[in-house]
């Protein structure tokens, strides 16, 4: 683990994501639809659906939206989506992974390539940067009003099955094996309010972003996240603190 705080980058994107909440709901609905269609509509028998429903609730997505996406998946017909990952580099040599759900791979590839080209990036071949990331479970617990020291939190994390704990003045950040994520989350949830809990891609090393590249890189990330077919964007960027 690189030791870099993922929380810092999450908070840096929060306001922009709040402004795009409708589009976020649309993307999560597509994820729910695809997973429910392939693995069944019952979250008890479909762990992947359960995780995405948790993601929907964390985004404050209305229950009716979740139900509509599941109901749509149980009907006949409907679009067939496939998962595709695009890999490339952004300004300052930052590695970027783009996960997409699409029913038209040519449309999506063209849009993603254009975003890279127009914003100082370069779309690479499959495998060009994915080896720089590890799949992990990620849990954040805000420290505000929390009367727990690092030693106690470390003990609780290890007991729950977590792999790593990183601490700052603002937050405890826990990383898990992806297969153990749900169990660790459920165990920690018994004692703490979780600010964030998700499966993610964690860079093995981060790239400090120079001040003169911040705006261009952020614009590239924003453009990619704005694409209807793009579900997640992961980077190795270490943005400077404001």
Curated annotation (Swiss-Prot):
This is Probable transcriptional regulatory protein LSL_0422. Keywords: Cytoplasm, DNA-binding, Transcription, Transcription regulation. It is found in: Cytoplasm. Residues 1-21 are annotated as: Disordered. Disulfide bonds: none annotated. Belongs to the TACO1 family. Transmembrane segments: none annotated. It comes from Ligilactobacillus salivarius (strain UCC118) (Lactobacillus salivarius). GO terms for biological process: regulation of DNA-templated transcription. GO terms for molecular function: DNA binding. It holds the Pfam family TACO1_YebC_N. The keyword Signal does not apply. One of its GO terms (cellular component) is cytosol. InterPro entries: Integrase-like_N, TACO1_YebC-like_2nd/3rd_dom, TACO1_YebC_N, Transcrip_reg_TACO1-like, Transcrip_reg_TACO1-like_dom3, YebC-like. NCBIfam families: PRK00110.1, PRK12378.1, YebC/PmpR family DNA-binding transcriptional regulator. SUPFAM superfamilies: YebC-like (SSF75625).
């Amino acid at each position: 683990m690189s030791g870099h705080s993922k929380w810092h980058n999450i908070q840096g994107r929060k306001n922009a994501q709040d402004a795009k909440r409708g589009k976020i709901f649309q993307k999560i609905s597509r994820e729910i639809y695809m997973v429910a269609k392939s693995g069944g509509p019952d979250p008890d028998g479909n762990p992947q659906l359960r995780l995405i429903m948790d993601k929907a609730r964390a985004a404050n997505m209305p229950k009716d939206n979740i139900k509509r996406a599941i109901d749509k998946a149980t009907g006949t017909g409907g679009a067939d989506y496939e998962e595709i990952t695009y890999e490339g580099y952004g300004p300052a040599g930052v590695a970027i992974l783009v996960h997409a759900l699409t029913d038209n791979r040519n449309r999506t590839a063209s849009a993603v390539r254009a975003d890279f080209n127009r914003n100082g990036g370069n779309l690479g071949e499959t495998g060009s940067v994915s080896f720089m990331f590890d799949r992990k479970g990620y849990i954040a617990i805000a420290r505000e009003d929390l009367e727990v020291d690092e030693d106690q939190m470390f003990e609780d994390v290890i007991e729950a099955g977590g792999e790593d704990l990183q601490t700052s003045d603002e937050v405890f950040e826990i990383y898990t094996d992806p297969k153990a994520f749900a169990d660790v989350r459920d165990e920690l949830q018994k004692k703490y309010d979780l600010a964030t809990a998700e499966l993610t891609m964690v860079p093995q090393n981060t790239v400090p972003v120079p001040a003169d590249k911040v705006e261009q890189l952020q614009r590239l990330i924003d453009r990619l996240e704005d694409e209807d077919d793009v579900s997640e964007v992961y980077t190795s960027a270490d943005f400077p603190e404001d």
